[in-house]
From Swiss-Prot:
Keywords: Carbohydrate metabolism, Cell wall biogenesis/degradation, Glycoprotein, Glycosidase, Hydrolase, Polysaccharide degradation, Secreted, Signal. It is found in: Secreted. GO terms for cellular component: extracellular region. Its main location: secreted. Residues 448-463 have a biased composition (Pro residues). This is Probable alpha/beta-glucosidase agdC. It catalyses: Hydrolysis of terminal, non-reducing (1->4)-linked alpha-D-glucose residues with release of alpha-D-glucose; Hydrolysis of terminal, non-reducing beta-D-glucosyl residues with release of beta-D-glucose. It comes from the Eukaryota. InterPro entries: Gal_mutarotase_sf_dom (IPR011013), Glyco_hydro_31_AS (IPR030458), Glyco_hydro_31_C (IPR048395), Glyco_hydro_31_N_dom (IPR025887), Glyco_hydro_31_TIM (IPR000322), Glyco_hydro_b (IPR013780), Glycoside_hydrolase_SF (IPR017853).
């Protein structure tokens, strides 16, 4: 939630190292004492010549560990012999079990050259990773490794960024250093770090390479002077801890990645409803009025959010006593809960250095970051001068739990249903070296002035309570391995990554801060700060509501964040370019980074949206997994009911989304169990079709639904690509035989979006929508059967209580259609009173041989609908012929 305050901030120390190949100047390493076993290989690596000390001191002795972990995964780790160099703590990213594989059974093979040491990873006769001809550099503050790539590779990943889904391959640098990035500019480092890339080689398969390293880094993709393609890692520290994984398809590769970083967390049923927020709701009356206006406009609103406006002078764990008084806030939350709706607020990591409970408790427990002389480390953010929680502190979880338990107490506080965490890169408005945070806060009016107090709501809100109507330190540790080498320059390392903010410490926490506990340096762990806050926040939410799935939406992420939280794509702006790029961002996070609860601020956060853009975005946003309208205080209000066409678009969007909610829930659950992505680029389902490799404006919503949005203003048509397959128009049911070519879809109203069902699919939908997901769960089901080219179709349905981390009972159905017969089988543990009331078979030109009161032909849709009354209590079979 960075605002215009930072737009004029100067870049500090923005030196950039050129593309010089230092590997040719450095001696590399020699492998000795090589030992090979059934499932592993180890070796000693010794510096092979005179140190070059390019950006630090060359380490003379390294270790090599190779593990054949499974038949599809290979672990290659190069680290210092003394294990003093920092490694990502297992408490942050638990390591996958490395036992059980063998070199003979593995699809991946490790080959090496001893002197100078280099290695290759092969799949069959194909080389996937090749470091030959470029010497390994392993220095105290700089590591470099280059791999050769095939010509014109199809590379994806290396987030977070707003560049193209398929990465550029010439003069391209991806910098990974989490930062507060207003307007999410292209070709810059953004909020998260995901050092994994996927190399898709068409019919030969897909493989991924994950570097488990949290230090700042530049990953360069370019060609040599003689045209040879390469990818090069340049990191500020850590070790080379690689995981190579392979699959026959991109989807298979994504599943393997999930096994390394952890399966995503399952979300509650209600979280897939529509959410509304805005930075700038002036008081609790305005929040209530927005809730009321949505109900009057007949636009379903599942969850209402409040930004930092609710806080007393922007201080976390406080309420503005005049604009958001506790009594009225509790009334608001009770009203929402009584109407089966939900409430979420924001919590930032930075705690105001002032007399408040969060600060006083933190100081008493010593859980804030300290400088190396033991004094409190201070920055400046929204509340003014701030302290920052140390997520490595042994007592940090207790502190965080206590703050949540007190402030969000259902009986005495604000009983939230989910949590929004922001500014957790961590952001610091005060530029480095920030020697006078008090002066900076004073000069920049932090905290900003609050709006005038309103004694009551100026307009009546029927149904709301009367109050909403108009009135007549722990000791630092220096011991332990894998913590980091001594005597490093933690502020200005010799090699400078291309951090858009300039120096490493600019607009964030100083990188020379040493954390409590093991004594990790912020220099090494900066990119983990947001994910560690995410984990602590998820734990705190579970502590206050044991057994219930906690929704936590975060801005800053690291690899594996999806196991704890969802992610919104940050402070975008109301432009068509950001509308378009949200698609590729969403696909990267959901399918490649395994963070499937994902979405962009619908209609844009910064600037002023337009009626057309917001109407189109409402339709697109309904196909994010996380669907929220949100914008900033200086922009015009953009709630969906503000414009007639946007309201109509939103109603249509939510109607389809809610009818599909169980399809969404089922596919999302599958990803949390297996890693199989729900949201997918086209090439995930058509991996041999080269025309899909660069397509980033269409996507699959599960395996069954192809979404092809209009992507520019003043347009009513879209050139949509249809692979060699059969598809059915969602609205008309008309069959479209794809031929591996573009098809122009015309006359697309601003309130519509082209949707097609992929042949071979059976989709369970609710028979009608509802105003809340609670009411939706009472609606019956309809099955839509879209036969494939071979005349068959299949699908699934998963149901549970919608909220429990470990449901007591589940319903897991499999649908198959073949030769006019529909079969339903599976696990029937979860009891529900709803039934399958109808089955619609697409692609039909004649009615079924059923009586008219049972079956009907919709010639306009080319579909036959058969009325049914199937209980979801046991297997069944229906003759649809």
């Amino acid at each position: 939630m960075l605002r215009s305050l930072l737009l004029l901030a100067p870049l500090v120390g923005a030196a950039v190292i050129g593309a010089r190949d230092h590997s040719q100047e450095c001696p590399g390493y020699k492998a000795t004492n090589i030992r090979e076993g059934r499932d592993s290989l180890t070796a000693d690596l010794t510096l092979a010549g005179k140190p070059c000390n390019t950006y630090g001191t060359d380490l003379k002795n390294l270790k090599l560990l190779v593990e054949y972990q499974t038949d599809k995964r290979l672990h290659v780790k190069i680290y210092d012999a003394d294990e003093e160099v920092y490694q990502v703590p297992e408490s942050v990213l638990p390591r996958v079990d490395g036992k059980g594989g063998s070199s003979k059974k593995s699809a991946l093979k490790f080959d090496y050259q001893a002197n100078p040491f280099s290695f290759k990873v092969k799949r069959g006769g194909e080389v996937l990773f090749d470091t030959s001809g470029s010497n390994l550099i392993f220095q105290s503050q700089y590591l470099s490794l280059r791999t050769w790539l095939p010509e014109d590779p199809n590379l994806y990943g290396l987030g977070e960024h707003t560049d193209s889904l398929r990465l550029e391959t010439t003069n391209y640098t991806r910098t990974l250093w989490n930062r507060d990035a207003y307007a999410i500019p292209e070709k810059t480092n953004l909020y998260g770090t995901h050092p994994v890339y996927y190399d898709h080689r068409g019919q030969h398969g897909t493989h991924g390479v994950f570097l488990l390293n949290s230090n700042g880094m530049d990953i360069k993709i370019d060609k040599t002077k003689d045209g040879k393609q390469y990818l090069e890692y340049n990191t500020l520290g850590g070790v080379f801890d690689f995981y190579f994984f392979t699959g026959a398809t991109p989807k298979d590769a994504s599943i393997e990645y999930a096994k390394v970083v952890g399966l995503p967390a399952m979300q509650s049923y209600w979280t897939f409803g529509f959410h509304q927020c805005r930075y700038g709701y002036r008081d609790v009356f305005e929040v209530a009025e927005v809730v009321y206006n949505y109900s009057q406009a007949k636009i379903p609103l599942e969850t209402m959010w409040t930004d930092i406006d609710y806080m007393d002078r922007r201080r976390v764990f406080t309420l503005d006593p005049e604009r958001f008084p506790l009594e009225k806030m509790r009334e608001l939350v009770s009203y929402l809960h009584n109407h089966n709706q939900h409430y979420i607020v924001m919590v930032d990591p930075a705690v105001s250095v002032s007399d408040n409970v969060g600060y006083n408790d933190g100081m008493e427990q010593g859980i804030f970051l300290q400088t190396q002389n033991g004094s409190l480390y201070k920055g400046a953010v929204w509340p003014g001068v701030t302290a920052y929680p140390d997520w490595f502190h042994p007592d940090i979880q207790k502190y965080w739990n206590d703050q949540f338990a007190k402030f969000f107490d259902p009986k005495t506080g604000v009983d939230i249903d989910g949590l929004w965490i922001d500014m957790n890169e961590a952001a610091n408005f005060c530029p480095y070296p920030c020697s006078d945070p008090e002066g900076y806060a004073r000069d920049n009016d932090l905290p900003p002035a609050a709006p005038p107090v309103r004694p009551s709501n100026p307009r009546p809100l029927p149904g709301f309570p009367g109050d909403f109507q108009p009135s007549s330190s722990s000791k630092r540790s220096t011991k332990g391995s894998k913590v980091g080498l001594p005597n490093r320059d933690l502020i200005n390392p010799p090699y400078m990554i291309r951090n858009e903010a300039g120096s490493l410490s600019n607009k964030t926490i100083n990188t020379d801060i040493i954390h409590a506990g093991e004594g990790y340096a912020e220099y090494d762990t900066h990119n983990l700060y947001g994910t560690m806050m995410s984990s602590a926040s998820r734990n705190a939410m579970q502590h206050r509501r044991p057994g219930v799935r906690p929704l936590v939406i975060t801005r800053s992420t690291y690899a594996g964040a999806g196991a704890h939280v969802g992610h919104w794509l940050g402070d975008n702006i109301s432009e068509w370019s950001k509308y378009r790029i949200s698609i590729s961002q969403m696909l990267a996070f959901a399918s490649m980074f395994q963070v499937p609860m994902i979405g962009s601020d619908v209609c844009g956060f910064g600037g002023n949206t337009t009626e057309e853009l917001c109407a189109r975005w409402a339709r697109l946003g309904a196909f994010y997994t996380f669907f929220r309208n949100h914008n900033e205080i200086t922009g015009i209000p953009q709630e969906f009911y503000r414009w007639p066409t946007v309201a109509e678009s939103a109603r249509k969007a939510i109607d389809i989304r809610y009818r599909l909610l169980d399809y969404i829930y089922t596919a999302f659950h599958r990803q949390t169990q297996t890693g199989e992505p729900f949201l997918q680029p086209m090439f995930y389902l058509y991996p041999k079709d080269k025309n899909t490799f660069s397509n980033q404006l269409q996507f699959f919503y599960g395996d069954a639904i192809l979404v092809s949005p209009v992507t520019d203003g003043s347009q009513t048509s879209v050139d949509a690509y249809f692979p060699d397959d059969i598809f059915y128009d969602w609205h008309t049911g008309a069959a479209l035989r794809g031929r591996g070519a573009n098809v122009t879809l015309s006359n697309i109203d601003v309130t519509e979006i082209p949707i097609h069902i992929r042949g071979g699919s059976i989709i369970p939908v609710r028979s009608e929508s509802a105003m809340t997901t609670t009411e939706l769960r009472k609606k019956g089901f309809e099955l839509i059967i879209a036969p494939g080219l071979d005349g068959t179709a299949s699908g699934s349905l998963y149901l549970d209580d919608g909220d429990s981390i470990e449901p007591r009972a589940t319903l897991e159905l499999e649908f198959t259609y073949r030769k006019g017969h529909l079969q339903v089988k599976g696990k029937f543990g979860f009891r529900t009173e709803v039934k399958i009331n109808a089955v619609t078979l697409l692609g039909q030109s004649a009615p079924a041989s059923k009586s008219a009161d049972v079956a009907s032909l919709d010639s306009g849709r080319q579909a036959v609908t058969i009325k049914t009354s199937l209980d979801l209590t046991g297997p069944s079979e229906i003759d649809l012929s």
